[in-house]
Design a protein with these regions (language model features):
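Conserved acidic segment of CheY-like receiver
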Residues: 1-10
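Short hydrophobic/Thr-rich beta-strand motif most characteristic of the beta2 strand and flanking loop
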Residues: 25-31
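Acidic, metal-coordinating helix/loop segments flanking the phosphotransfer/catalytic sites
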Residues: 32-47
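Conserved phosphotransfer microenvironments
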Residues: 50-66
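Conserved phosphotransfer cores of two-component systems
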Residues: 67-73, 95
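A short, hydrophobic beta-strand element within the central beta-sheet of small alpha/beta folds
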Residues: 74-83
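Alpha4 helix (beta4-alpha4-beta5 surface) of REC/receiver domains from two-component response regulators
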Residues: 84-99
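Output/docking surface of receiver
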Residues: 96-108
Length: 119
């Protein structure tokens, strides 16, 4: 099953893509809330990764929509953001994110995170 990612930053997208290739994970990118939810419905990924600093994804609203939809609520949602955005991290947790971490921790554990999304 693919992993769905909502990440605006092209450098970070390429890092995710390269790491996914290394661990044999299929990654699909989506940007807007409608795209993310539509891809989640059609692909049924085991994991959705959301950059909480995304300007296109409405990250907190999209996480809430995922978790409020009975067909999508079981999909694990991981958010990441700059550690200085404590309010954004708290909002993502409040919206139902399964895990929220600083961007540096996400980058450092990316291979493990992607591998965990394979099952």
């Amino acid at each position: 099953m693919p992993i769905l990612a909502a990440v605006d930053d092209f450098l970070f997208r390429s890092k995710i893509r390269a790491t996914a290739k290394h661990v044999n994970a299929e990654i699909v990118f989506a940007q807007t809330p409608d795209e993310i939810l539509a891809q989640a419905r059609s692909l049924k990924p085991t994991l959705v990764i959301i950059d909480l600093n995304s300007t296109k994804a409405d990250p907190v609203g999209t996480i809430a929509a995922l978790k409020q939809d009975p067909a999508l609520a079981g999909i694990r949602a991981i958010g990441f953001a700059s550690h200085v955005h404590a309010d954004l991290i708290a909002a993502a947790r409040g919206a139902g994110a399964d895990q929220v971490m600083p961007r540096s921790a996400f980058a450092g554990n990316l291979a493990d995170i992607l591998t965990s999304g394979l099952s």
